[in-house]
């Protein structure tokens, strides 16, 4: 992918605006497609992520499931999720690669109060700039997928970057390169949507009538998409939300109420200025002067 697609179009806690849809270059937008029907849960993608990003999580404890590590962390940016479900009287073992979805309308970026701590590139990748992170955790609350994780060692938040450093020089993400079954694909979003529809058609031909593409509209679509056997029940895949949306409080705080808050601050500041000009500064009165007036 060309370097020019790395132009930043959004920064947290700034007034940068997303270009209108009619002028966005969809050919420049990238996406990762994960076909859960061909994933074997080998965790090669987890290892590749750890190796490329030079992150090492602590050795955990067995909690009675195949998930290892048991959850995402500041040092585990992707994990395999294993779920058992019964469909039509048959047991199904569903596997899903979990990690940042790189939303087109990222709740983490909207919620973040630190200027430039979270950015979004023109190609759709959402990236954390750790040097600007203040560790407030608002991005965690703003994410409808519960992805960002706080590192207690440096009090900064981390997540999958979609290997933005590799993508910027024309390489695919490390997890895509290492997948032995070709379950993970990478390219332009247009290409990935076309490929996803082909995979869905094959799944439906095999009897999965509810197969579909997971690209939720509630967050403007995502740059990490899934092909699911049971797209009508995404929650079967370890709680994947059916209709994820940015929390109303975040939308109000950083949306409709933001101008009001700014106006309130300006009005307060102006009031202080007028008070100073019209009345002058408050004077301190000592005890002797106060007794004299009495």
Swiss-Prot record:
Keywords assigned by UniProt, alphabetized: 4Fe-4S, Cell inner membrane, Cell membrane, Electron transport, Iron, Iron-sulfur, Membrane, Metal-binding, Repeat, Transmembrane, Transmembrane helix, Transport
Cofactor detail note: Binds 4 [4Fe-4S] clusters per subunit.
Keyword Transport set for record: yes
Annotated binding of [4Fe-4S] cluster 2, by residue: 49, 160, 163, 175
InterPro entries for the chain: 4Fe4S_Fe-S-bd, 4Fe4S_Fe_S_CS, FDH_Electron_Transfer_Unit, Formate_DH_bsu_Proteobacteria, Formate_DH_C_sf, Formate_DH_Fe-S_su, Formate_DH_TM
Subcellular location: Cell inner membrane
Periplasmic side, ranges: 1-256
Known cofactor(s): [4Fe-4S] cluster
Function description: Formate dehydrogenase allows E.coli to use formate as major electron donor during anaerobic respiration, when nitrate is used as electron acceptor. The beta subunit FdnH is an electron transfer unit containing 4 iron-sulfur clusters; it serves as a conduit for electrons that are transferred from the formate oxidation site in the alpha subunit (FdnG) to the menaquinone associated with the gamma subunit (FdnI) of formate dehydrogenase-N. Formate dehydrogenase-N is part of a system that generates proton motive force, together with the dissimilatory nitrate reductase (Nar).
Subunit structure: Trimer of heterotrimers, consisting of subunits alpha, beta and gamma.
PANTHER family (UniProt xref): FORMATE DEHYDROGENASE, NITRATE-INDUCIBLE, IRON-SULFUR SUBUNIT
Additional information: The 4Fe-4S clusters from PubMed:11884747 are renumbered in standard order.
Protein name, as recorded: Formate dehydrogenase, nitrate-inducible, iron-sulfur subunit
Taxonomic source organism: Escherichia coli (strain K12)
Gene (name only): fdnH
């Amino acid at each position: 992918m060309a370097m020019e697609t790395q132009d930043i179009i959004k920064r947290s806690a700034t007034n940068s605006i997303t270009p209108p849809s009619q002028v966005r270059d969809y050919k420049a937008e990238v996406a990762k497609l994960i076909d859960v029907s061909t994933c074997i849960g080998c965790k090669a993608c987890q290892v590749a992520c750890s190796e490329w990003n030079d992150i090492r999580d602590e050795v955990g404890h067995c909690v009675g499931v195949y998930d290892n590590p048991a959850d995402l962390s500041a040092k585990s940016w992707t994990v395999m999720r294993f779920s058992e479900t019964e469909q039509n009287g048959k047991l199904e073992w569903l596997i899903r690669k979990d990690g940042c979805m790189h939303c087109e309308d990222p709740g983490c970026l909207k919620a973040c109060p630190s200027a430039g701590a979270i950015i979004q590139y023109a190609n759709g990748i959402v990236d954390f700039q750790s040097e600007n992170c203040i560790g407030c955790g608002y991005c965690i609350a703003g994410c409808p997928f519960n992805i960002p994780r706080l590192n207690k060692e440096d009090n900064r938040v981390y997540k999958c970057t979609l290997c933005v450093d590799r993508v910027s020089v024309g390489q695919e993400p490390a997890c895509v390169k290492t997948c032995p079954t070709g379950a993970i694909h990478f390219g332009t979003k247009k290409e990935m949507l076309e490929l996803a529809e082909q995979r869905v058609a094959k799944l439906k031909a095999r009897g999965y009538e509810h197969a579909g593409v997971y690209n939720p509209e509630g967050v403007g679509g995502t740059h990490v998409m899934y092909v699911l056997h049971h797209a009508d029940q995404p929650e079967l895949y370890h709680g994947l939300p059916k209709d994820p949306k940015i929390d109303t409080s975040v939308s109000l705080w950083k949306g409709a109420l933001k101008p009001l808050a700014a106006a309130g601050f300006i009005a307060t500041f102006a009031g202080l200025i007028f008070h100073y000009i019209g009345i002058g500064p408050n004077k301190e009165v000592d005890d002797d002067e106060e007794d004299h007036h009495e």
